[in-house]
Amino acid sequence: MSSLFTPYKLGPVTLRNRTVRSAAFESMGRHFGPTEQLKEYHVSVARGGVGMTTLAYAAVCRSGLSFDKQLWLRPEIVPGLRGITDAVHREGAAAGIQIGHCGNMTHLTTAGQIPIGASTGFNLYAYTPVRGMRKDEIAQVARDFGKAVHTAHDAGFDSVEVHAGHGY
């Protein structure tokens, strides 16, 4: 049995060990982009010796936002994200990002529209009605996931995790 603290090959990426800081919402974004606080947090995790640290809960499009301090993965925030990934890499760790569309859990104020999700119902965070997506909206969100993966690559991330649980 291999040791937890030995290198591990994850696809094309070699992690220095098998420990991963999983994606858990940091609530450290500003204007849906990264902050110095978010960078310092992940750099400190990397400095602590983790094999990979994962930024959490980045929406793939505006309609997928749930919280004010959440990331919205789009080209204009790539420089800030690149600052994080470069700094994490300098500490010897890999950098991942979790992407998703919050669906039934989006907020009217952050998403800028009535929440849309897989089905009609209510947002459990804000008790706001949710409209079920039309086929064209489903297709657009699927395209947004693809764009987000490319944006993550441009920002220097080594991996992408898709968040698709509990109402998303």
Predicted regions and their residues:
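Short beta-strand segments at enzyme active-site cores
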Residues: T53-A56, A95-I99, A155-Y168
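Short acidic/His/Gly/Ser-rich catalytic and metal-binding motifs that mark active-site loops
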Residues: R62-G64, T106-L108, Y168
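Non-globular sequence segments
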Residues: D86, G100-F157
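N-terminal capping/small domains of soluble enzymes
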Residues: M1-G100, V141, V149
